[in-house]
Amino acid sequence: MERAMEQLNRLTRSLRRARTVELPEDNETAVYTLMPMVMADQHRSVSELLSNSKFDVNYAFGRVKRSLLHIAANCGSVECLVLLLKKGANPNYQDISGCTPLHLAARNGQKKCMSKLLEYSADVNICNNEGLTAIHWLAVNGRTELLHDLVQHVSDVDVEDAMGQTALHVACQNGHKTTVQCLLDSGADINRPNVSGATPLYFACSHGQRDTAQILLLRGAKYLPDKNGVTPLDLCVQGGYGETCEVLIQYHPRLFQTIIQMTQNEDLRENMLRQVLEHLSQQSESQYLKILTSLAEVATTNGHKLLSLSSNYDAQMKSLLRIVRMFCHVFRIGPSSPSNGIDMGYNGNKTPRSQVFKPLELLWHSLDEWLVLIATELMKNKRDSTEITSILLKQKGQDQDAASIPPFEPPGPGSYENLSTGTRESKPDALAGRQEASADCQDVISMTANRLSAVIQAFYMCCSCQMPPGMTSPRFIEFVCKHDEVLKCFVNRNPKIIFDHFHFLLECPELMSRFMHIIKAQPFKDRCEWFYEHLHSGQPDSDMVHRPVNENDILLVHRDSIFRSSCEVVSKANCAKLKQGIAVRFHGEEGMGQGVVREWFDILSNEIVNPDYALFTQSADGTTFQPNSNSYVNPDHLNYFRFAGQILGLALNHRQLVNIYFTRSFYKHILGIPVNYQDVASIDPEYAKNLQWILDNDISDLGLELTFSVETDVFGAMEEVPLKPGGGSILVTQNNKAEYVQLVTELRMTRAIQPQINAFLQGFHMFIPPSLIQLFDEYELELLLSGMPEIDVSDWIKNTEYTSGYEREDPVIQWFWEVVEDITQEERVLLLQFVTGSSRVPHGGFANIMGGSGLQNFTIAAVPYTPNLLPTSSTCINMLKLPEYPSKEILKDRLLVALHCGSYGYTMA
């Protein structure tokens, strides 16, 4: 009866308190009953449960084998912690990682728990498995107040962890100033190295901790490298920590020159070193000038080494251009720069800032001497060539004028065997000497062209940084004009020099015109690489392109009004952000990514030539489009032409293909190439034939009575439009007919659509600079914009990958390619669009198809077959998910259903 009453009382208490009132007998179950109470510091409940229990307060549980005292110390449950200590909990018990309750209290800054643990003889010198003590944890987190209390109990403030690091090391690394001062005041060794030889100063510099580095240096810290020779300054420069470098230089001035010399080190990231120099140059005018002068001197030394034929060309070239880039960057960001309109000497004024270029004048003088020397040798060889030709003519007994003979080229072995004298030995000694001199000159050009061209590039960079944006240095233009013949000789000998060093051509139309014929003679692939290299210069690194998309930057468009909605969002978007990347989402659809972007360009390009907008008309061949001279029927036509230019510019910028082809004349307008009468054939073939007839025949006695004017329809009325001032009274004759044909061509092909062309180019040039696009002709521009018009199935097969179980020899794959061969060209285009999001193959074929993160081959992945299952695709990675169909017939049926019914629309996979 008494026992039953006791059980009833326990039940009542339990129900009233909504918890158990006694612990289970086994420790494992009991500890999980107590743990939440300890974490909540419910010390009365814990005390009551422990009072009538045999629970072991030192019982270790869980994966890390901690006791309840660990839990209390970790959570700051000071009342429960005291209770457990009074019950006999061991303050020095270590969990599986070697941590004691004191470690956990120190790590989390539980001051009261630490004090109580110390009262109960917690050992502050115990290390965990990594060698960390309680003071290490306090130093890591900068808990200076607690450190003051604890350090008096520590036997060795320089106790090391497993890596030989003391509390001072970690406090310096994390930038805790007061903690560092406390440790130093307590006798910490300021120069103590860890196992790799790194001192506290080294640790402070490794994370750019300027303040802790300054404290250490003020207290006499030594500037010491680690065991690998890496110095604190090396770490500061590697991290771009300009402020910390500044502190090091204050205490060790010799390090200034060390930083300057680091500009030659290819292993150091240029952008980090540039950050350091930028910060240092902002500290004072004198330091700014000192940095620039020092960089100019180093650049001059490197430039002269580059001009030495015994030096390593590649290493010296990279070093010179690297130094000059940094020099120009620092020069521009100074207090006086071209961007803020303050004169810097480019008008001839000898300001202090212009004087920093003085050391470089030695290099430019050497460059000029080299070019003059080569020009002299070239001129001498030309004279010798004429003399040699005369000698050869005399030997043959000919009376022809030497001027009619092609310029002399040094003959190869045996080339004199056909001379009338019959043997090589009969060649005059003077002739041999001149030939050798010519060969020597060619050898000198071969050996020096790249070196001199690199110095020319450096010269251009230095001239440009002294000029306001958009202006080319008159001095540099004069330099190129002076050495025009030699530079063209360099380029003719090695055309790659243009792409490697003559970047100035892209920024100066006057100079570009001198070399354009040479540039356009270079392979299309090389010009494409040069185009995109400079188009994307100055944009974020490639690893930043795939950063998470900002929701505000997504172009949200409506599929049912894609033209107008796209025009609206693109006109409002940030142009610079659109250059970096495009994110498109169709209203009401979830999908995003490169596949959606490709589809957007594909559909939008078709809408641009939609007759409803009256922007473009179809040419005579029915396959290309030309701006519509009557587009004014659409009140917004010029805004729409500007938008069309933006879309084509964006597509070219991001290597996306558009699904339209334009007339040759329109491509010429984009490129700035004059049209000719042959271009008229695209809009009026019969009229083009008439123009051709005029040019091919003598019209003197035909009585055509043509004048330099034409009749044209202006709002339904015929009006006479002069081709030039007073054209109505100027007769077309045999002598001026070519001018007439050109002027009437310009009227039909240019003047009639000039406002439309101007609006289009305004949008196009927002993304594609005119100086870059002129690298191509009209045929190449079509390839860049629209890709290859035909799909080469053999090339498709060659550049396809297989995954998820498929291999090239599998029957399903064999059937698939047989089906691709059988279907129409239009269905192949649908298949390509179904998988990649684009209906065009880029120039270079399927090997150049782009995916979400660069080049991505067409891929076919195996999918288990179920009846009626259709193929699906992942357009971002150009992947066709093809079920393992049991027969070719079923495969073809299901594939065509997917192509004709599922080519548009995106959902999340």
Swiss-Prot record:
GO terms for biological process: Golgi organization; membrane fusion; protein K48-linked ubiquitination; protein ubiquitination; Rac protein signal transduction; regulation of cell migration; ubiquitin-dependent protein catabolic process. The keyword Glycosyltransferase does not apply. Sterically autoinhibited in its dimeric state. Pathway: Protein modification; protein ubiquitination. Keywords: ANK repeat, Cell cycle, Chromosomal rearrangement, Cytoplasm, Disease variant, Endoplasmic reticulum, Golgi apparatus, Hereditary spastic paraplegia, Membrane, Neurodegeneration, Repeat, Transcription, Transcription regulation, Transferase, Ubl conjugation, Ubl conjugation pathway. It comes from the Eukaryota. Changing L11D: Monomeric; promotes autoubiquitination and ubiquitination of RAC1. It is an enzyme of class 2 (transferase). It is found in: Golgi apparatus, Golgi stack membrane; Cytoplasm; Endoplasmic reticulum. Its EC number is 2.3.2.26. The keyword Transcription applies. It catalyses: S-ubiquitinyl-[E2 ubiquitin-conjugating enzyme]-L-cysteine + [acceptor protein]-L-lysine = [E2 ubiquitin-conjugating enzyme]-L-cysteine + N(6)-ubiquitinyl-[acceptor protein]-L-lysine. SMART domains: ANK (SM00248), HECTc (SM00119). GO terms for molecular function: small GTPase binding; ubiquitin protein ligase activity; ubiquitin-protein transferase activity. Autoubiquitinated. The N-terminal lobe of the HECT domain is important for interaction with E2 ubiquitin-conjugating enzymes. It is linked to Defects in HACE1 are a cause of Wilms tumor (WT). WT is a pediatric malignancy of kidney and one of the most common solid cancers in childhood. HACE1 is epigenetically down-regulated in sporadic Wilms tumor. Moreover, a t(5;6)(q21;q21) translocation that truncates HACE1 has been found in a child with bilateral, young-onset Wilms tumor. Spastic paraplegia and psychomotor retardation with or without seizures: A form of spastic paraplegia, a neurodegenerative disorder characterized by a slow, gradual, progressive weakness and spasticity of the lower limbs. Rate of progression and the severity of symptoms are quite variable. Initial symptoms may include difficulty with balance, weakness and stiffness in the legs, muscle spasms, and dragging the toes when walking. In some forms of the disorder, bladder symptoms (such as incontinence) may appear, or the weakness and stiffness may spread to other parts of the body. This is E3 ubiquitin-protein ligase HACE1. It comes from Homo sapiens. The gene is HACE1.
